[in-house]
Design a protein with these regions (language model features):
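Conserved P-loop NTPase motor module
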Residues: 1-9, 16, 20-21, 27-35, ...
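Conserved P-loop NTPase motor cores
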Residues: 11-133, 159
Length: 182
């Protein structure tokens, strides 16, 4: 595995194996990063909440938290994402999710429902105006949080970039079939 980029895709995995598969993939990624002594490494983990959420195993959650801290301690980058903040704070009073957030210097908060924005308000020191703003963001807008500095940002893409990264079901269907619904 000497490639610059290694992707472990679990998208076709049966639902009852997702947690085990995610743990396996995360463990492999961690081992690879630990063996890259002279190079900066980055772990980009989408939906890692499955290992720290309500139905997760505390040992797996502890492994994820320790992994994020270790990667950061080595000067690497650990990027995690979730569409539901509640998931991160469901296991054992949210200690694992809070630990992951605390280990992350930079946080990007995209649009979310008020209940979820309130859940992270104290953890990220968000003002009432920032909570309100988060609930009103449109696609491509977010709040960049670095320590106590919070800056609203907007991402703009070229058509080529949008086509490469879109997750819009409508746009993906058009891309796949070449047809626009009437």
């Amino acid at each position: 595995l000497n490639n610059k980029y290694i992707v472990l895709d679990l998208s076709g995995m049966p639902d009852d194996m997702i947690a085990d598969g995610t743990f396996w993939a995360t463990s492999i990624a961690y081992d690879l990063i630990m063996n890259c002594e002279d190079e900066l490494s980055a772990l980009l983990a989408d939906e890692l909440w499955s290992l720290v959420g309500a139905t997760a195993n505390p040992q797996a959650a502890g492994f994820v938290l320790e992994m994020v801290k270790t990667i950061r301690g080595l000067g690497g980058i650990a990027v995690t994402s979730t569409q539901g903040m509640q998931d991160l704070f469901s296991l054992e009073g949210g200690s694992y999710g809070k630990g992951i957030l605390d280990s992350s210097r930079i946080k990007l908060v995209m649009q979310m429902e008020e209940q979820e924005a309130r859940l992270i308000q104290d953890k990220l020191n968000l003002s009432e105006d920032e909570v309100r703003q988060i609930t009103r963001f449109r696609r491509g807008e977010g709040l960049l949080c670095i320590g106590y500095n919070h800056v609203p940002i907007a991402f703009h893409t070229t058509p080529k970039e949008y086509e490469a990264i879109t997750t819009s079901p409508t746009d993906l269907r058009i891309k796949r079939t070449g047809q626009i619904d009437e």
